């Protein structure tokens, strides 16, 4: 028979090892539950790649990059217009709408709806993307989200019903027929923009998604 003191001496270290193993496993469990500061995803679609998709406490953040294979003008420089008619470039803005549970974020030239008349269509500014070069962009959609389209009234969107996110970027082939104009916004930042007619017929799109809506981060 073993001496009781010796048996206890053998059992105690084993218990301590088991407890230590449980303590070390807790961070892995928290990580598996998605408790990360940001949710990063990557998915390519031709020239466009989404490099990050995060649902923060105050905004949905989408970061993307564009990679040039042929010379194009990227239509991703949106602006806001004041009551006095002044334009202000909005580097974080995208057109926002919901379609069947998908939050669609668009940076492109949009057609004027047939049921309305406008004095002048909204034409975003453009950036040159040359072969072998890259451009980056960031979109921040403030929460709670709202529809943001150039020819429609803003209205709230129900975040709980949005299951995924789609990104669409417009671009124009660099051809002689493309008419570009030089301008500046209300604080003097330069802007190049195309004529609406030639651009709306030549515009092409790069799409990524739908991507799963990320979990909202905790403060």
Where on the chain are the PLM-derived regions?
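Bacterial signal peptide processing site
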Residues: 23-25
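C-terminal motif of bacterial Sec signal peptides marking the signal peptidase cleavage site
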Residues: 19-21
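Beta-strand-rich interaction surfaces with strong enrichment in secreted/lumenal proteins
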Residues: 50-52, 123-129, 154
């Amino acid at each position: 028979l073993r001496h009781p003191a010796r048996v206890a001496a053998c059992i105690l270290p084993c218990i301590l090892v088991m407890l230590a193993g449980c303590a070390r496993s807790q961070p892995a469990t928290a990580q598996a539950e998605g408790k990360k500061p940001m949710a990063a995803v990557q998915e390519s679609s031709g020239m466009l790649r989404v490099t990050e998709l995060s649902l923060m406490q105050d905004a949905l953040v989408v970061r993307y990059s564009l990679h040039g294979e042929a010379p194009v003008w990227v239509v991703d420089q949106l602006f806001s217009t004041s009551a006095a008619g002044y334009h202000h470039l909005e580097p974080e803005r995208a057109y926002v709408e919901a379609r069947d549970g998908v939050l669609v974020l668009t940076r492109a030239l949009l057609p004027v709806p047939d049921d309305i008349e406008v004095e002048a269509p909204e034409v975003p500014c453009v950036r040159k993307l040359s072969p072998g070069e890259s451009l980056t962009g960031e979109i921040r959609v403030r929460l709670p989200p709202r529809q943001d389209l150039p020819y429609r009234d803003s209205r709230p969107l129900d975040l709980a019903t949005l299951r995924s996110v789609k990104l669409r970027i417009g671009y124009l082939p660099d051809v002689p027929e493309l008419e570009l104009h030089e301008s500046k916004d209300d604080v003097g930042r330069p802007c190049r923009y195309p004529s609406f007619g030639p651009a709306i017929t030549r515009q092409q799109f790069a799409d990524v998604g739908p991507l799963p809506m990320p979990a909202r981060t905790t403060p």
